[in-house]
Amino acid sequence: MSENQSTATHKSIWDRAMDDVTATTNYAYLVNPSERIIEDAVKDVYDRGDVSIRMLASEQRVKSALDAFFLKAQAAEAIESDMMQIRTAEIPTVSFVVSQDTLNTIISVGETATIGELTDSNIRADLFRESETEWETGDEYTIRSPPLSRVQDRLAEKFGESVRDDFDAALERDIAVDGVILLLLLAAKHELQFYQMGGCGEDLGVGSRATFSRRKTVLSEAGVIDTESVPIDIGRPRHRLLLNDSKLANLAFPDLIQQVKRMIEQE
């Protein structure tokens, strides 16, 4: 039987489910979540740091939900820190969060979601056991992104705190942006060498040098960035990335990203 049913934003619903879980434990299964719940779960687990969530979902849904670089990097951080694990499997149509002591169903509709607490201990025990079984046979989902803190630390170490500060400002605004585009715009904003940022991004696993070159072409053709040669003693000249417009250069970094996204979409 369901009781205490309520409707609110996805984040509020997720917060309530987690408050129920953490009242007695820090370990639960999240089964068949919607894309919005996946997003909120990743952000919340990353911020809480004191929970262990096992997510069971379809591969396509997880891939779609974690498309944005910042969210993907937060998920990678949570996984590396053992706060979250993700596996894909054939799963039931109902969405729920279950621990040994609590069971909440979650229904997502548009911009809102509904949560219902199920108090029948037999149903809860059955779903917990079924989730354990599905988990054991599920396929581990690999996130092809470096953990967020690794990116932050490397940017500060290699390029300075001001570069990391701009990265963090974009993170704070939760801007959905491709990771390679993000790093190229950081480089152009701070007039860094393309070779250095491309190498850093490749070492981190954000993208290959070839991907950085392709994205640079996209930004150049959209009129966003330009380059200037940087002479070196030996070998081919390197190129420094520059923003092509003083109006772009004067924008705060999060606003720069948003403006560039609009410019690319118009191409």
Question: Where are the predicted features?
Answer:
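PLD-like (HKD) phosphodiesterase/transphosphatidyltransferase domain
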Residues: 1-55, 165-168, 238, 242-247, ...
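HKD-type phospholipase D/PLD-like phosphodiesterase module
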Residues: 56-101
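Signature of lipid phosphatidyltransferase scaffolds
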Residues: 107-171
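Short, cationic-aromatic polyanion-contact patches
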Residues: 229-256
